Amino acid sequence: ESMPAIERWFRLEWMEHTPPLYTSADLRNAGFKLAPVDTNLFPATFHNLTPEMLPLAVQAAMAAIEKICPEARNLLLIPESRTSNSFYLQSIQRLIQVFTQAGLNVRLGTLDESIKVPSPLPLPDGGELMLEPLVRNRGRLGLKDFDPCTILLNNNLSNGLPRVLQHLHEQYLLPPLHAGWPLRRKSKHFDSYEEVAKKFAKLLGMDPWLINPMHGHCGKVDFHSASGLDCVRDNVEATLTKVRRKYKEYGINEKPFVVVKADNAAGAGILSVRDVKELDDPEKVARGRSACSSTEEGQEPSELIIQEGVPTYERMNDAVAEPVVVMIDRYVVGGFYRVHAERGIDENLGAPGSSYVPLAFAGSSQLPKPGVKPGASAPNRFYMYGVIGRLAMLAAAYELEATDPDAENYE
């Protein structure tokens, strides 16, 4: 019933804020609550989109390019440097396909300085991708005989900010450098998400908690010396207390939990805590240290986010599942379920052994059916996933504006 009001609200927000070029959001559906638990600004999941979703993705890519650089011919795509993962390569292949069909010449440049000549990367389907060394020419970045208007980054820069990407004032670098992990913080994102959720909840006359995971933040935590663990304890206790209060208010008979994870890394390491006393257990703390430092580069986390745990009651073939929504520009272009047979409803599903089941977001049959109980029919549920995914993307837009180091130059 609220669909016209929701879509108008988004339309007005996008008049004020620029969406990231692409985003994916991991959602958790607890039945009583539907919320994002992670928002990725360098999605590597385009291979999970079904062929039916591709026309949507191409249209969204066209819309994005028309706004950024309407006369664009060339697009330089910079993937992760460690590119042997076949799923990741398939995602890059799909991204190239989308932007090629949107009318661009797409070529791949690598930040790996050991690559001096164009180097083929074999694909599972027998094809190959060609990685080429970057060429920096004063204020512009390209490849040999290839000068792009836009540079699309699909590398979260967890190794640091490369000099070759800095001070590119004549081209569009998307997402911007401050979207990478050297500068980005999950806690800042969820601060922005809280702001967005409050505005949206006010529109619908609902409690923002139903779409927003509470969170706290700890800087400078050293698991080895236990310094800073007091901050973790305080935040765990405070968050659990607030969640207990909410569970009581809504008559939810669940034991709340929080997750502790690195604030400035994309890795899968998380620690689930149901009682602050668990942090007195040296074994649990050691597990937390290894979980939070099994982030992509294995570096010790010094900053942590403590986030309300949202259980997932989604199931695919009896395995626990969570929806992931994929967006280009301001449009939902598809989604999939991340499924893990060995994990519980309160555990991280982005772990080895997970599988992916595409969601048919597209197709006219998936428009919400007015008058049906919210969430009862699959289309209504998918629509809500798309709404929450877009709220996470809008929060990313707020976050990137708030953390833009050059913002004062544009005033």
For each of these PLM feature ranges, what is it?
Residues E1-H17, K199-W209:
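Short glycine- and acidic-rich boundary segments immediately preceding or forming the N-terminal edge
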Residues W14, F42-L76, H340-E411:
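C-terminal active-site "lid" helix and adjoining low-complexity regulatory extension at the edge
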Residues H17-F46, K261, G309, A321-V333, ...:
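Conserved metal-phosphate-binding beta-hairpin within the catalytic cores
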Residues D26-G31, L41-P43, S81, P133-V135, ...:
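Short, flexible loop/turn elements at secondary-structure junctions
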Residues R28, K33, A238-R245, Y250-F257, ...:
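Phosphate-binding site of ATP-dependent enzymes
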Residues Q59-A60, T83-K255:
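Conserved N-proximal alpha/beta basic substrate-recognition cap immediately N-terminal to
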Residues G216-C231, F257-V285:
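Glycine-rich phosphate-binding loop of ATP-grasp-fold ATP-dependent ligases
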